[in-house]
Swiss-Prot record:
Protein species of origin: Haemophilus influenzae (strain ATCC 51907 / DSM 11121 / KW20 / Rd)
GO molecular function annotations of the record: unfolded protein binding
Major subcellular site: cytoplasm
Recorded coiled-coil stretches: none
GO BP annotations listed: protein folding; protein tetramerization; protein transport
Protein's UniProt name: Protein-export protein SecB
Length: 169
């Protein structure tokens, strides 16, 4: 009977854990440098969108993940900047029981995927408060971005090994 309890306890310890501890806005900025005259121009926006993540271990099995979103909208005809919106949506997560690749996937895909709806809503609200037409960011496939990143890493590693072999000969 006690062996079964030990086996169950050992199995529970090995189970992967991903828990949200806190989600918060770390930084936010909205600039509309050409108001009010921008509204007198024809609204043909050109949208620039950048997305990145930062990860910091803040304790045992505790990680802060920051999703950085930057949106810059200019008018096609004049090139004038309509607005710049920057959001750093962050969260602290308890993560344990994962191997290296699984941990990387969790930190760069799963956690940002949880943060994105909050960031998207904040961007939409800021643009709305600037009295610009609605901006609804499309969903982001963080899994595809992770696979793309891993493929780039593998290609770079293969290239480095190839260069090392060529210098040896």
């Amino acid at each position: 009977m006690s062996e079964q309890k030990q086996d169950v306890a050992a199995t529970e310890e090995q189970q992967p854990v991903l828990q949200i501890q806190r989600i918060y806005v770390k930084d936010v900025s909205f600039e509309a440098p050409n108001l009010p005259h921008i509204f007198q121009q024809e609204w043909k926006p050109k949208l620039g969108f950048d997305l990145s993540t930062e990860t910091t271990q803040v304790g045992d099995d505790l990680y802060e993940v920051v999703l950085n979103i930057s949106v810059e909208t200019t008018l096609e005809d004049s090139g004038d900047v309509a607005f710049i919106c920057e959001v750093k949506q962050a969260g602290v997560f308890t993560i344990s029981g994962l191997e290296d690749v699984q941990m990387a996937h969790c930190l760069t895909s799963q956690c940002p995927n949880m943060l994105f709806p909050y960031a998207r809503e904040l961007v939409s609200n800021l643009v709305n408060r600037g009295t610009f037409p609605a901006l609804n960011l499309s969903p982001v496939n963080f899994d595809a971005l992770f696979v793309e990143y891993m493929n780039r890493q593998q290609a770079e590693n293969a290239e480095e090994k190839s260069e090392e072999e060529q210098t040896k000969h």
